[in-house]
């Protein structure tokens, strides 16, 4: 069997395009909430050291909410007198001695989420607010933590006793700067705002939550996948969308657990185990140690799979592996429905040509070589199948859906209509079943494809598919140069305008914008080499 983890590590060492991969490890919140202790954390670290998880890439042991004991007279944090009577340093030293990295938790406001929702009274007035430099020095210079999850209950007036409403960008940026001021450049900061907070987060965090808290149910997993389907553009340059901690081994069916883990892997979410590692079942452990799925998550390109097509609740997603526009890609067929479905894969959707070798990554076995439209798969209800495809050659990508594009003003924490920010929206008339609406009316509210690949460069005919109920205009830029102002005429279905553009060899950026008025809704862009 091919050792995909070894291949990924080799490429990581040699490729100039390699990025730090998503965080892998264990976190205390899902199973224990605030009911933790130093002994419990060390037992979990010991278990992760014994059961082979370290060898496949899990290396962070994260202490979530529940360790706080208030502050002393000088404002320094102190730990819970019963749960952590000896402080945090002893626990962190134990974690480090096992060869792991240690993570911690705090809040951008005054109180933690546990103090409000779990009535953990010692979690009041322990957040970063008013103590940014002091707490950063404590966590990262004095104690030696390597990771931090930062919540926002203390900044959300509905979730703190002071009814304190804070600005997310200001608070998380200030904390980011305080961490940098410690001299530590290796700390991974996770922003926990429970929805995509805005593109500013890419500049301050290693990862960010895109949904409400997970729970061990199919509806929760399905909803989180749904929220992340069209966020692939924001997982870039070694920064990742966080789908929340894993609920593997906590009561869902085998197929649901497989979908949960497989989709977290191919969508490049952090992989933080949330169950009790001292009692984990062999079946759950085997899934969590699947090296071939982990290799998708830890791939050197750091890409999140994007939606190629959807068919009545079945989604096909893909991403390149090891080399951009190379001959290898991963494909997930995800069945969100309550019925078994049979799907035929068309390898042309992935631009693979000739015989294609197919490997099932759940079963960890080769399925043989297939030609275009010759491969079908049956997916049970709530199930997912993930394949590695190796083709003889690869054509250039020609279709770029709008829902795969970067929206500069995109955010999900406030009403997009009130704040006039663009958003992804389902629309059965559009090619991929979705579009981008609410674009334009200011310079920053634009759409941009960051990853338009051309092998040789040259002239292309670019077709922009759109919808609008009235005459509208968009400005097309290629690599920062305005190419054309496009007049879009009323089209309740989908209409198209064509533009001749020139691409350079390698990666290109194509932007659609209008700083003065509203743009049409954008369905997709199609490129044809001239």
Regions found by a protein language model. Name each.
Residues 13-15:
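N-terminal signal peptide c-region/cleavage motif recognized by signal peptidases
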Residues 22-28, 57-64, 101-106, 146-151, ...:
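Structural recognition of the beta-strand scaffold that forms the well-ordered cores
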Residues 40, 44-161:
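Aromatic-lined carbohydrate-binding/catalytic grooves of carbohydrate-active enzymes
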Residues 100-118, 176-198:
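Aromatic-lined carbohydrate-recognition surfaces of secreted/lumenal glycan-active proteins
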Residues 125, 181-276:
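Glycan-recognition surfaces
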Residues 264-267, 272-274, 310-352, 382, ...:
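Carbohydrate-binding surface patches
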Residues 272-337, 416-440, 506:
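Glycan-recognition and catalytic regions of carbohydrate-active enzymes
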Residues 341, 352-358, 365, 369-530:
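Extracytoplasmic
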